[in-house]
Amino acid sequence: GMYPNNGESPLDLSNFPNCKAVVDVIYNPLKTRLLQQAEQLGMKAVNGLEMLVAQAKFAVEHFLSTEIENDKIDQITLELLKQLTNIVLIGMPSSGKTLTGKALCKYIDKTVVDTDAVIVERSGMSIKEMFARHGETYFRQWEHDVIEEFSKQNGLIIATGGGAIKNEENIQNLKQNGVVMFIDRDLEHLLVTDDRPLSKDTNAVAKLYEERYPLYTKYGDLRVPNNYPMEISQQELDELMNTILEGYHEILCHQWA
């Protein structure tokens, strides 16, 4: 499961019912499929990043005849996690994922990628046009391929399309290097727009909301309420960004490190 062979796993942990913990010395991706399955089965899962840092610490001590405090291992590991781990945004169409992603990159040193925008740029078609010409299945394959590509990278803010959560493999890919944030906007605040093929009227939006909300809550590592007005004030924007960043750092400290 090491890059570039992400998604592969040497074994199925369901065949080891007495297993309590799994250590995978791979650190690229940060969570291999093996570690993801371990977490799903309630096992302790540890990657190889801390071991890499510890190895470097002892190598420096040996070759430079110096001493480094052991707590530096944890500090450096956490700093690396902050640099490497992606922030992934999921949620309903018009929940604010794209705008949140663009704003967030001004608060943290990461590059924003909007998967729908990448699809439009590379295909030469709008999402609406792609649906009309080729259907949803064709679009979902594009979406899968773009997510698969960017989820292998590090240091990104990835804003996904509203339906990305329909394919569990998308979530597995996004979680291998990312913390998933569910941008949760109440139904009455979601917009109906003609350029969104699956949410072009109020009834369609309500149906999507009912179908997808359980998936957003299932896959999100953190739920981020976003009922701020479209013309958001700087104070409100700061509040939203702080909620995301505090949650992100909390997850890195307690679930990843």
Whereabouts are the PLM-identified features?
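Rossmann-like adenosine-cofactor binding region
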Residues: 1-45, 164-170
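Adenosine-phosphate binding glycine-rich loop
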Residues: 21, 25-85
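NTP-dependent small-molecule kinase module
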Residues: 74-83, 99, 103, 107, ...
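Hydrophobic anchor at the beta1->P-loop junction of P-loop NTPases
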Residues: 89
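P-loop (Walker A) phosphate-binding loop of NTP-binding proteins
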Residues: 92
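Conserved glycine(s) of the Walker
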Residues: 96
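ATP-dependent small-molecule kinase phosphotransfer cores
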Residues: 114-172
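A glycine- and Lys/Arg-enriched "phosphate-lid" helix/loop adjacent to the NTP-binding pocket
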Residues: 177-215, 219
